[in-house]
């Protein structure tokens, strides 16, 4: 048996999600090979080769894989699939687009967002916004799996796997790149941030996010998140959304400001190591999962907290 892990990367380096998905892939009990597909992605492939537990790295380097189009990548994975018993990828936005296509082309059922490998054919995954854990046994000869990486430790270095080039698959011609707008920020990306400060609908405006949430995040060296309600109201961009329909995070510290704690939001952050909630409603559901709670007006409490951090030299 051999498992193929699809790497999440930016060509220059691997994303943390890849290291964590490798831990899940290794738990299947088979040799793990890693596919790095991109343009100018040799550095990412070399990084994958250094990960402990990787037997071989496949590098598909070409313009076809430059812009994360799902159809060409799915076609490449399917062309490699006969050599593997399982195909694994982190459950990132990119692979939520790619892996269902792979499963459909292979005519198998995808097992989504697993949080535990019970056996090579049996997995646990959250359902009902994380309120129940479902055990799934796959009878498909070839497994297609995405991994909720927040529940797995990152694999370390220590390997020296060979890097082998593979040819690009035929372009299905089903999509073409038109353009992209990339959000640039000096703050940590949400899924890899050790500290996150998130704001909810109580922030009331985009300006208040900039006035209250962002200065606190800057003092803590944190990523900035938002609830779905805040994003839907236009107070924060989509890529800040934390929750079942946004990003699932598990930082060392999660600070929820003006977030009531809807079940959809809790599903995306309840695995955080320490949760701090600031809300003037003492009955807000967020306090049920918080390790520390402050019942206070955020417009008074957050500036005071930011100022105190400043005194500490943050």
UniProtKB/Swiss-Prot annotation:
Cofactor(s) the protein requires to work: FAD
InterPro entries recorded: DHS-like_NAD/FAD-binding_dom, ETF_a/b_N, ETF_a/FixB, ETF_alpha_N, ETF_asu_C, ETF_asu_C_CS, Rossmann-like_a/b/a_fold
Disulphide bridges, residue numbers: none
GO-annotated biological processes: fatty acid beta-oxidation using acyl-CoA dehydrogenase
Keyword Flavoprotein annotated: yes
Keyword Transport: yes
SUPFAM superfamilies named among the record's database cross-references: Adenine nucleotide alpha hydrolases-like, DHS-like NAD/FAD-binding domain
Record Pfam families: ETF, ETF_alpha
Single GO MF descriptor: flavin adenine dinucleotide binding
Keywords (A to Z) from UniProt: Electron transport, FAD, Flavoprotein, Transport
Residues reported to bind FAD: 253-281
Cofactor: binding comment: Binds 1 FAD per dimer.
Role summary: The electron transfer flavoprotein serves as a specific electron acceptor for other dehydrogenases. It transfers the electrons to the main respiratory chain via ETF-ubiquinone oxidoreductase (ETF dehydrogenase).
Xref: PANTHER family: ELECTRON TRANSFER FLAVOPROTEIN ALPHA, ELECTRON TRANSFER FLAVOPROTEIN SUBUNIT ALPHA, MITOCHONDRIAL
Family, as annotated: Belongs to the ETF alpha-subunit/FixB family.
Self-association and partners: Heterodimer of an alpha and a beta subunit.
Stated name of the protein: Electron transfer flavoprotein subunit alpha
Organism (species): Bradyrhizobium diazoefficiens (strain JCM 10833 / BCRC 13528 / IAM 13628 / NBRC 14792 / USDA 110)
């Amino acid at each position: 048996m051999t498992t193929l892990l699809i790497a999440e990367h930016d060509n220059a380096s691997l994303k943390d999600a890849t290291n964590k998905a490798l831990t899940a892939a290794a738990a299947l009990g088979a040799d793990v090979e890693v596919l790095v597909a991109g343009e100018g992605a040799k550095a990412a492939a070399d990084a994958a080769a250094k990960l402990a537990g990787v037997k071989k790295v496949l590098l598909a380097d070409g313009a076809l894989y430059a812009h994360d189009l799902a159809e060409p990548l799915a076609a490449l994975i399917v062309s490699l699939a006969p050599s593997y018993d399982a195909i694994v990828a982190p459950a990132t936005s990119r692979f939520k687009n790619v892996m269902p296509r792979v499963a459909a082309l292979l005519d198998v059922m995808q097992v989504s967002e697993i949080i535990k490998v019970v056996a090579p054919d049996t997995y646990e995954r959250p359902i009902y916004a994380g309120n129940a854990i479902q055990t799934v046994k796959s009878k498909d000869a070839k497994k297609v799996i995405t991994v909720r990486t927040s529940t797995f430790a990152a694999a370390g270095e220590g390997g020296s796997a060979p890097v082998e080039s593979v040819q690009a698959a035929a372009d299905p011609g089903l999509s073409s790149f038109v353009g992209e707008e990339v959000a640039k920020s000096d703050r940590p990306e949400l899924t890899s941030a050790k500290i996150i400060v998130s704001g909810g609908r109580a922030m009331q405006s985009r300006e208040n996010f900039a006035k209250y949430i962002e200065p606190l995040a800057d003092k803590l060296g944190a990523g900035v998140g938002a609830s779905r309600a805040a994003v839907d109201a236009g107070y924060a961009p989509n890529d800040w959304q934390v929750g079942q329909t946004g990003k699932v995070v598990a930082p060392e510290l999660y600070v929820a400001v003006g977030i009531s704690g809807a079940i959809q939001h809790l599903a995306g952050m309840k695995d955080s190591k320490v949760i701090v909630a600031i809300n003037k409603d003492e009955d807000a559901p967020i306090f049920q999962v918080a390790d520390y709670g402050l019942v206070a007006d955020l417009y008074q409490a957050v500036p005071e907290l930011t100022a105190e951090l400043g005194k500490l030299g943050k």
